[in-house]
Every structure is written in structure tokens, then in C-alpha cells.
């Protein structure tokens, strides 16, 4: 570190800092990120602790930052005010140089004696070096009363009250909020990789049965994707994995299909087959179908994997390996993003209702439901059947919602 200065964040650099946060967290814990929006909301909240929100400046340039908010330990009707820390970010090209550690140590020293504790969700192996201990040692649980190894505490006084940790609502952002905020930044592709904690921002289960069924199927799909280890297989040959279709747009309903596009620098069939061999050899794998489209204008290889989940339900992973930089690079990812932008809560429910009413033996591509509802206002199964007679299946395949109007 050269000429490192830790100082309060300045309003004039808020946007630059949000860009830095977005860059440093992108694809780290889930496809894309939400930390830049969390900080944006935190600044206008009543819980931010501005004197502990520091910027790291190195050689006159922003290199990172740290943010604190007020939180609480709740014990019955009693509430004890504590601090929570995060996010902590360091510019991508300045990481692993001690800047993040310097921010943490500096702010913890500033907070000492002012609050009883700093409580966070984090990795014990990393944060232990700064004096954080398992919150369970102090009788502190999550908001639901469960002991959680990821809840850590840096005690600032000798007496720490037990109870349930409540980080407040400032850290809770919805996928819709994140997408809207992201529209104010340069577009950037979201990827899946094996090191991510989540394949979608974690949200509580919906109460409405239709929405719960979709939420639960997506949750199960994410577990299948993780348990199958296909991400590790693609990463072993440098593949960049993107979600498309209903899995990416959170519109899964009944069919256990996961659509993925994988971008590689070349289409080497033997190399890909070797990379996928551990997946193929799994006792959970039923079969693999391969289609060679490398010589077509689509420049792709299709790998259709059938496998069982832990409950012996059959899933299909439709993995399309596409030549990076070719004509179709990013096309369906853009469609999925546009569908999510266009599908508000009521529109989403109409799409899911049509999918739910669709007979199991009738194979209809998900994009048809989306086009029928979003573009043409279809609201019932009868209307959808009429609409489908007037719109041959190949027409929706070339459709993308207009989100600019």
C-alpha cells in the first residue's frame, strides 16, 4: 500500500464509490450483485453511522470503502442497539493488499466504547483475525431464534446481552429494485460460478401458493445445479456460464428444466466431454444427449443432461455451449433480462398461472407464455390457445420485450 489514506466518504464521490462497489462485488456471491444498491439506500436511511463510513484513498484515487449501520439485539420486549458492518469493498485491481483489513481495523477502533458490539454475517476464518467471535458464545441467534455460525460479534464491552440479532431492513433489497438501479449503470453480463453462495438474491418464501410453487422449484433447481457440479466442469475448461430462460427470469412453474448458455473460446468436443465426465459418471445421472452444431451459423454444441435430484425427481439441464463472440453471444441473456424488466408482479402471476394450467403432455416454450402475456395481454388459458393458433411457435422465438418505451 502506498500513500493510503482512510477518511470519511464525501458526497461528491458517492456515484464513483457505487461504481467501485458494483465492480468489486460483481458475480462474487450471486450472479450480478446488490451491494451498490444497499449502500445507496443506506446513505438516505436513518440507521447509517456516517462517522464510521470511510473511504480508502491510495495515491489520490478511491481504492475502497466500508459502511456501518445501527442494528439491534432483541430480547422479548427489550431492544439493545448495536452496530453492523458492511459492505466492505476494495477496488478489483487493489485487492489482496491489506486495504480491506486496514478499513476494518480503523473503524473498529473508532467504534470501541461507543456501542456494545459490532455484529455481522461473515466468514469466521477471515473475520476472526479482527476479534470477531461466534455470536452463539453470547447467546445471540438470528431473527428466527436459530444459532447461525455465520453471525459473528466483535464485543466492545464486558457485558453483551443475549437475544435475536436484527440487522434491520436497509440490507434487504428485492431483485426488482436491483434491476431498476442497475439500469443506471453500464450494462454487464451476469454469470454463474461454483463459488457463489446464491444463484439468485435470497428472498423469503411467498405466501401465495402459485408464487410459492415457483419459488420452491427455483430453489430446488439451484440445489440441483450446485449438487451436479456442472459449474465446476465448465470452469475447468474456462467456460463462462450464464442462465437463460425461465431459470434466469424466475418464472419456473412445473417443468424441471434448467437452461444454461456456456461461452468458450473454442468448441472442442473431446475436451468438453472429458470435462463433463465426472458429471456423467455420477450415480444421479440418467443420460447425456449431444448435438453438434459447431458447423452451423449458431456455432454451438448442445449438451442435454438428465439427472435425478435427492428426492429422485428427474431434471433436465439444457446446456448450450456457444463460441464466445459469435452471433448468438448474449442474445438470450438479454431476452431474459428484458422479460424480468417487463414482468411486474401481476404480469408475472399471469405468466405463472398459464404455465400452471398447461397440460403436462403439452410442450410449450416458456417464451411463448411471456410474449402472449407481456406483448398481447393474454389473461386466460382459452385466450392463450387462440393466441397460439395465430402465432406459430417460431414467431415468439425471435421476440424480445420492448423495455425502452
What are these regions (language model features)?
Residues 18-21, 25-67, 72:
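Active-site rim helix/loop that mediates acceptor-substrate recognition in acyltransferases
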Residues 85, 90, 96-109:
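Conserved acetyl-CoA-binding loop-helix of GNAT-fold acetyltransferases
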Residues 283-323:
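Conserved catalytic core of two-metal-ion nucleotidyltransferases
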Residues 316-405:
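Catalytic cores of NTP-dependent nucleotidyl/adenyl transfer enzymes across multiple folds
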Residues 113-146:
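Conserved active-site alpha-helix within GNAT-family acetyltransferase domains
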Residues 230-273:
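Active-site nucleotide-donor binding segment shared across nucleotidyl transfer reactions
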Residues 200-244, 405:
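Helical scaffold of the NTase/Pol beta-like nucleotidyltransferase catalytic core
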Residues 4-17:
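A short beta-loop-alpha structural element at the N-terminal edge
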